[in-house]
């Protein structure tokens, strides 16, 4: 589904025309996107976690629900947390709205060196020194460093981390930068109910 597939003239909404959301089913089995505690019911798409621009199909209800037309969607790579990489090649993480913890998912907007595009990079997320500390690992799998480009990866950390029992705790993400230096960033995390 690409940007050219939009048959409507509604304006694209969301931060910079794009949001990152989890895909769920409600009690009636209808698919919805959960984004910042709001439910958006797509009229044309289903997946597990995706980035997408959308067009509102009328008013968003006062309690954060509304029908949306998904202009296009791209599923985000979702490796299993707790699996380590055999190597840890550096990468840089953007401090932007896409790098976030929401709905039990850690989503990382990163930049790294890429070769010709035929080599798939691997990502691992392992437990750090404390219960709410995780370490992101990146393996280029021998890909040649020709140019820098960005990407998205997400991890369902809800079952990987201890239950916060309704409290918001500090989640620390650690990684190695492309310059080989250690880095970290903190997020508010609350277990998905």
Where in the sequence are the language-model features?
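Bacterial Sec-dependent N-terminal signal peptides
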Residues: 1-18
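Transition segment at domain starts
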Residues: 69-99
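Extended, well-ordered protein cores
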Residues: 24-26, 30-37
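Flexible glycine-rich surface loops and low-complexity tracts that mediate binding to linear polymers
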Residues: 45-72
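Short beta-strand elements
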Residues: 180-193
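Short, solvent-exposed, Trp/other aromatic-anchored flexible loops in extracytoplasmic proteins
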Residues: 48, 52, 140-180
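Beta-strand/loop nucleic-acid-binding surfaces
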Residues: 35-49
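Short helix-loop boundary/capping segments
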Residues: 95-145
